[in-house]
Regions:
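Bacterial N-terminal signal peptides
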Residues: 14-23
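Alpha-helical interaction segments
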Residues: 12-14, 72, 169
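Coiled-coil-like amphipathic alpha-helices with heptad-repeat character
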Residues: 4, 24, 36-37
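Conserved nucleotide-cofactor-binding alpha/beta core module
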Residues: 109-228
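Class I SAM-dependent transferase core
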Residues: 28-117, 125-129, 133, 146-148, ...
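Bacterial N-terminal signal peptides that target proteins for export
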Residues: 2-14
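Ala/Thr-enriched low-complexity intrinsically disordered regions
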Residues: 5-7, 20, 27
Length: 248
C-alpha cells in the first residue's frame, strides 16, 4: 500500500509539472513579476499602471522607464518597488504610488528649460524624475535624515542638476526663485502664500490640499499675477509639517 501511495504521488507531481506550462501560459516564470528583472518590472509598471491610465507625455514616460525606483526604497521593499502602491521609506514617510508621480509630473507640462521646486524630497525619486526632464530641480526636505540620504543617493546616481535643502518647505526657497513649476508632495490645509509668491508668471504648481482624510490634488496657474485653480483628483498624502512639529 505504501509503495502504491508513493507511486500515485509521483504521478500527480509529474502531471502538475506537465500541465504547468499550459495553465500558466507556457512562460509562467517570465510573465510573473516576482521572477522578472527590475528592468522588465519597470517596463511593466509603465505599461500597465501609467500608460493604461492615460498618461501620454513622452518625456514623463521616458523618465519613468529610466529612473530605477527600486534604488529609492529600503532593501526589504525592493521587490515591491514597481507595484501600484506607495511604500514606506522610514521616519513615517512614504514614496508615492508611481501613477501619482506620473500624473503630478505630467500636469506641470515640463521641458528642458524649466526650473522646478519640489517640496518634500522624501526618497528623492520624484526629484530624479523631474531632473530627467527639467533644467534644474530644487528640493526641500524637513526631515534631515531623509534629506541627507536622498542627497547622497542622487549624487551617487550622477544627478548634477538637483539641489537639496533641509528646511521648512512651507517657506519655499526664495533665493532660487522664481520657479517655472512647483510640485508639493505633502498636504497642507491651505495653499502656502510663500509658494504662490515664488511661482513665476505663467508657472504651474501641483499640490495636495486638505485635511488628513479629505485631500484634493490641485493644479494652480499664475496668470497676470493671479492664481487660477483647478481640481485634479482626490488623493491622500502625508501632512505638511513645520519645524515645530505641527501640521500646516
Amino acid at each position: 500500500m505504501l509503495k502504491m501511495a508513493n507511486t500515485k504521488k509521483k504521478l500527480i507531481c509529474l502531471l502538475i509539472c506537465m500541465m504547468a506550462p499550459f495553465v500558466f501560459g507556457g512562460t509562467c516564470r517570465a510573465e510573473n513579476p516576482f521572477f522578472q528583472s527590475f528592468e522588465k518590472r519597470r517596463e511593466r509598471m509603465v505599461r500597465t499602471q501609467i500608460e493604461a491610465r492615460g498618461i501620454t507625455n513622452k518625456k514623463v514616460l521616458k523618465a519613468l522607464r529610466k529612473v530605477e525606483r527600486h534604488k529609492f526604497v529600503p532593501k526589504e521593499y525592493q521587490r515591491q518597488a514597481y507595484g501600484d502602491y506607495p511604500l514606506p521609506i522610514g521616519e513615517g514617510q512614504t514614496i508615492s504610488q508611481p501613477y501619482i508621480v506620473a500624473l503630478m509630473t505630467e500636469v506641470l507640462d515640463l521641458d528642458s528649460t524649466k526650473k522646478v521646486l519640489e517640496i518634500g524630497t522624501g526618497s528623492g525619486y520624484q526629484a530624479a524624475i523631474l531632473a530627467e526632464i527639467c533644467e534644474s530641480v530644487c528640493t526641500i526636505e524637513l526631515i534631515g535624515v531623509l534629506g541627507k540620504k536622498a542627497e547622497k543617493l542622487l549624487a551617487d546616481l550622477g544627478y548634477e542638476n538637483i539641489n537639496v535643502k533641509i528646511g521648512d518647505g512651507y517657506q519655499g526657497w526664495k533665493e532660487h526663485g522664481p520657479f517655472d513649476a512647483i510640485i508639493v508632495t505633502c498636504a497642507p490645509s491651505h495653499i502656502p502664500q510663500p509658494l504662490q509668491d515664488q511661482l513665476a508668471e505663467g508657472g504651474k504648481m501641483v499640490i495636495p490640499v486638505g485635511k488628513k482624510f479629505t485631500q484634493e490634488l490641485v493644479l494652480l496657474t499664475k496668470h497676470k499675477g493671479k492664481i487660477k485653480k483647478k481640481d485634479v483628483i482626490p488623493v491622500r498624502f502625508v501632512p505638511m509639517m513645520g519645524k515645530d512639529g505641527k501640521a500646516y
